[in-house]
């Protein structure tokens, strides 16, 4: 027992006596206590110390206590909040930085808390300031994209750095900028930094950017928990470089989008552009998921309310161009949440803008719709497509789009006869 105490308890044998005591005089004792108390206060009031990670690293600029009612159809009537507004910040484009300097090492970063901590390390190592403000530097930017043409529609496509095949498939299909004759479309892929920080991958992305000029990338970690940052990057880019664009769609890289139906049946270029317009698949009355094992887990510390405001599924929503700047600016005074579509809904509630339902509730789908040319000629989004599937079904729809439902009926009858014969 004595050996264990010597190895693991004390580095040197000490005997205690009044002669050795730090408190052998009243004055020394008082000074020692004052010093210890001062050190305690110093360490207790600094959140940047190592070993103290947590939600304090997440940008927090308000205390939220609202959105408790699910009866109201409006997005703001049940808004009961205590806001702590931050000083207005102007939209300032950041100069692109050299990607060769991106030498962080967030290997294996997963989960909400680790992502927030890694974001903080990027700020510290890059010297970009405190994460309470949105100041991520551009690695790749396209500031002159809207100077060459005046787009009617901008497609903001959230993509992972390694999804090269998905980006190629989108360029060949629904993201083709020449898809609608007489209608200017701009396609922009939104990227962060790959968790693996593969130098070859970053070089390939830069080559891809030089060829297509449709990638914008900033130096935040590209994770699920940073989708809100990615979307705000797109909003800020539109507000800064394409402020007069009538409409914007934000969607994901695994989506099927019927761009022609979106333009001609929903947005209708012949009509005057709408303002404060936001639509998609409406999510009403949803409660925060408190299951810590869930992908959609929302900690009570971040969002204590019992209900989310009305929001649109992040798989695909459409909004008027004037909202890009409004959403980005109001976000600077709102606590950042990792659920991007919920967060955008909160921004809209603060702006007192109600998302409106689309003409048909099956136009926007955040699930995969079984394919038929008839169904896909009358929808805008369908989810979970591999690049090869996207090309296959897109080509089939283009071949049959003028008689989509008639051809679909013929194909169905042909399959029925084939099964009957065999």
UniProtKB/Swiss-Prot annotation:
Any one of the GO BP annotations: oligosaccharide biosynthetic process
Residue spans of biased composition, Polar residues class: 95-110
Location(s), subcellular: Golgi apparatus membrane
Pfam families: B3GALT2_N, Galactosyl_T
GO CC annotation: Golgi membrane
EC number: 2.4.1.86
UniProt membrane topology term: Single-pass type II membrane protein
Residues making up the signal peptide according to the UniProt record: none
Transmembrane portions of the chain: 21-43
InterPro entries named in the record: B3GT2_N, Glyco_trans_31
Mutagenesis / variant outcome for changing residue 44 to S: In strain: HMI/Msf
Protein name: Beta-1,3-galactosyltransferase 2
Lineage per the UniProt record: Eukaryota, Metazoa, Chordata, Craniata, Vertebrata
């Amino acid at each position: 027992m004595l050996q264990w105490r010597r190895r693991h308890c004390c580095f040197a044998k000490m005997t205690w006596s009044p002669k050795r005591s730090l408190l052998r005089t009243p004055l020394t004792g008082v000074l020692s206590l004052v010093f210890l108390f001062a050190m305690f206060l110093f360490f207790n009031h600094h959140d940047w110390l190592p070993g103290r990670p947590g939600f304090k690293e997440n940008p927090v600029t308000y205390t939220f206590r609202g959105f408790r009612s699910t009866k109201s159809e409006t997005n703001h009537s049940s808004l009961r909040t205590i806001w702590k507004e931050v000083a207005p910040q102007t939209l300032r484009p950041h100069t692109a930085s050299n990607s060769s300097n991106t030498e962080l090492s967030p290997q294996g970063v997963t989960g909400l808390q680790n992502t927030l901590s890694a974001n903080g390390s990027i700020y510290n190592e890059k010297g970009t300031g405190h994460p309470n403000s949105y100041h991520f530097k551009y690695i790749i930017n396209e500031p002159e994209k809207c100077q060459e043409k005046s787009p009617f529609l901008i497609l903001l496509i959230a993509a992972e750095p390694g999804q090269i095949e998905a980006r190629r498939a989108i360029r060949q299909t629904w993201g083709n900028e020449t898809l609608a004759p007489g209608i200017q479309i701009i396609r922009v892929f939104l990227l962060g930094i790959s968790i693996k920080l593969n130098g070859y991958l970053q070089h390939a992305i830069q080559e891809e950017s030089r060829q297509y000029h449709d990638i914008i990338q900033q130096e935040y970690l590209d994770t699920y928990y940073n989708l809100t940052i990615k979307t705000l990057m797109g909003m800020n880019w539109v507000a800064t470089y394409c402020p007069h664009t009538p409409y914007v769609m934000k969607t994901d890289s695994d989506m099927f989008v019927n761009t022609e139906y979106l333009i001609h049946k929903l947005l209708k270029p012949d009509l005057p552009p709408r303002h404060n317009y936001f639509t998609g698949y409406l999510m009403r009355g949803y409660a925060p998921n408190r299951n810590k094992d869930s992908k959609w887990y929302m900690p009570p510390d971040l969002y204590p309310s019992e209900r989310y405001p009305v929001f649109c599924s992040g798989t695909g929503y459409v909004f008027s161009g004037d909202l890009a700047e409004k959403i980005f600016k109001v976000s600077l005074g709102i606590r950042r949440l990792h659920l991007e579509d919920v967060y955008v809904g909160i921004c809209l509630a603060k702006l007192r803008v109600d998302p409106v339902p689309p003409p048909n509730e099956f136009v926007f789908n955040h699930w995969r719709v079984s394919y038929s040319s008839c169904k896909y000629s009358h929808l805008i989004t369908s989810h979970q497509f591999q690049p090869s599937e996207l090309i296959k079904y897109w080509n089939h729809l283009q071949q049959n789009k003028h008689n989509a439902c008639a051809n679909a009926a013929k194909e169905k009858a042909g399959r029925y006869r084939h099964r009957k014969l065999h």
